């Protein structure tokens, strides 16, 4: 699949799109259900997965990584095929299409279910579905972070020192362990005919690796199970 244009993606906020949106939930999950299910919509296309993975280097600097994002997107595609999702065709995305998906995910981050229900389908994606002869289209968008091991050790030592200092002052031992990685996945189903979102399920998991196939499989099953209505492989 084509890889996103690094320069254009770097113009967007270098953040995890879903973390802010899901921080207020206890389970790291956000859902919107507009009546769509595998049994009710019949034929559905899916866009080739997109991914936005950032890397925290040894010094603690975090930035978007094009190569890691490409690997993550490929893993989502593999996990989706393993799960036997009810998809008739996978539609490729050119640079404009990938940019549209990233911008759309940015707009969805933090949106309430009420707002998701009235948000229009992006014009580029709507046109791609209509040209391919499909009313419904699935977006799978991965988001996440991986941390350099040396930075992880340094941050862990720093947090431990802070914990010891607080224990001396308060008598309570509290040590915060930095995340080695964070993985998130969002599944959005578009209705090109009615120009609206009919399904949206996003999940964030700390210490699950966006570059690990087994972790990615778990996320795919999680975000799609309400739509499919059955256990996925």
Indicate residue ranges for each PLM-predicted region:
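Context-gated lysine
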Residues: 8-13, 61, 114, 158, ...
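C-terminal/domain-edge helix-coil "capping" segments
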Residues: 27-56, 127, 131-133, 144-233
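Flexible, glycine- and charge-enriched loops at secondary-structure boundaries
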Residues: 17, 65-69, 209, 213
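N-terminal segment of the mature soluble domain
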Residues: 58-146, 200-201
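Sec-dependent bacterial lipoprotein signal peptides
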Residues: 1-25
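Prokaryotic Sec-type signal peptides and long signal-anchor helices
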Residues: 21-22, 108, 231
